[in-house]
Structures are given as structure tokens and as C-alpha cells.
Amino acid sequence: MTVDALSNADNQDLRDNFIANRFLSHEAKLLDQRRFTEWLDLLDDEIRYIVPLRLMALDFDREVRADSFHINDGKVNLKVRAKRSSVSSGWGETPPSRTLRLVGSVMTDRIDQEGVLEVESAVIIYRQRAAIGQGDVLAFRRTDWLRIDGGTVKLLKRVALLTDASLATPNLAIFL
């Protein structure tokens, strides 16, 4: 990126970047505070939430297959997962994970679909489950599609591509 590219950025680009950063920061805070009901309100009814399986390959283009996923959920399944995370019988999250999400390298792009903003970001999540011991670190790149309708912003689709091909965490019960 050159300085000229930055100086030629128009107000729409700056506005889009502000909207995306604000949305992602707010979402991270809700998830870190385990406010899952409020987080679900940020999701579009047509949400697709995808975490593809990553393979070891020499070529980047061959690291992800279109038919292999850790997670491939819609809103109904996300509601079930959120509810399970907030009850004591949800054994995958007992005790509940304490998390800290860092979202950065946010880049936005308008796409052909009316009112939809494509957002790329890099995310690091630190997760601690026990009172003592080492926590987990998950690093990944995300591509989100945000639907902007009037003053409302909703997450329409998320693809989170984990850096690790082999997970060093006991589960993916937390939301990426």
C-alpha cells in the first residue's frame, strides 16, 4: 500500500472501515464476556458460520477443501451452541472458558451484493479454562460478510481459517 492509496481513500472507504472495526470490536467484547444472547442478535437470520478443515500442503490454494469442516452452522445450530455454553450441563465448557480476543489487520471491501461489506481480519484468541496451567492460543484469519441495512449491521457469513492444521486445543466450543 502506498501513501497515495491512503490519501486517495474516499469517505465511504473510511466509513466502511469504521463500521467493520466497531462491529468486530463490539462482537469480541460480547463473546469475551459470554453475553451470547446479545451476540446472537448480531447475526443475520441467513448466517453461515464456517470453520474449514486446514490441510498440510505446499500450495496455499490446496490447504482448504470445499467439503471438509470443523464447523458449518446456520443460525439454529449457533443458538443451540450458545445456549449449551451458558448452562452448567454444557460439559464442553465446564468450567466456562475465559477468553480474550484480539482482532486486527482489518480490511474492508464493497462487493456486488447490495448492502454487503466484505471484511478480512486476523484474530488471536487466548483461552483459559482451568484455575492454573497453560491456556490455549488460537490464531486465524477471518473473512466476514456484514449486511448493512439502514442503521443495522448483521453478520451474514463468517469463514474462519485456523492457522493450525492440527488443533492444540481440546475443543472448538468457543465462537471464533
From Swiss-Prot:
Database matches in InterPro entries: NTF2-like_dom_sf, Rng_hydr_dOase-bsu
Pathway: Xenobiotic degradation
Regulation: Activity is stimulated in vitro by coexpression of a [3Fe-4S]-type ferredoxin.
Keyword field: Oxidoreductase, Plasmid
Gene Ontology biological-process entries: 3-phenylpropionate catabolic process
EC number: 1.14.15.38
Catalytic activity: a 1,1-dimethyl-3-phenylurea + 2 reduced [2Fe-2S]-[ferredoxin] + O2 + 2 H(+) = a 1-methyl-3-phenylurea + formaldehyde + 2 oxidized [2Fe-2S]-[ferredoxin] + H2O; isoproturon + 2 reduced [2Fe-2S]-[ferredoxin] + O2 + 2 H(+) = 1-methyl-3-[4-(propan-2-yl)phenyl]urea + formaldehyde + 2 oxidized [2Fe-2S]-[ferredoxin] + H2O; chlorotoluron + 2 reduced [2Fe-2S]-[ferredoxin] + O2 + 2 H(+) = 3-(3-chloro-4-methylphenyl)-1-methylurea + formaldehyde + 2 oxidized [2Fe-2S]-[ferredoxin] + H2O; metoxuron + 2 reduced [2Fe-2S]-[ferredoxin] + O2 + 2 H(+) = 3-(3-chloro-4-methoxylphenyl)-1-methylurea + formaldehyde + 2 oxidized [2Fe-2S]-[ferredoxin] + H2O
Enzyme class: oxidoreductase
GO molecular function, one term: oxidoreductase activity
Function: Part of the multicomponent N,N-dimethyl phenylurea N-demethylase responsible for the initial N-demethylation step during the bacterial metabolism of N,N-dimethyl-substituted phenylurea herbicides. Catalyzes the mono-N-demethylation of N,N-dimethyl-substituted phenylurea herbicides to their mono-N-demethylated derivatives. Is active on isoproturon (IPU), chlorotoluron, metoxuron, monoron, diuron, fluometuron and fenuron, but cannot transform the N-methoxy-N-methyl-substituted herbicides.
Subunit structure, as described in the record: PdmA (subunit alpha) and PdmB (subunit beta) form the oxygenase component of a bacterial Rieske non-heme iron oxygenase (RO) system.
PANTHER family: 3-PHENYLPROPIONATE_CINNAMIC ACID DIOXYGENASE SUBUNIT BETA, BLR3401 PROTEIN
Family note: Belongs to the bacterial ring-hydroxylating dioxygenase beta subunit family.
Record's protein name: N,N-dimethyl phenylurea N-demethylase subunit beta
Species per Swiss-Prot/TrEMBL record: Sphingobium sp. (strain YBL2)
Origin organism lineage: Bacteria, Pseudomonadati, Pseudomonadota, Alphaproteobacteria, Sphingomonadales
UniProt gene name: pdmB
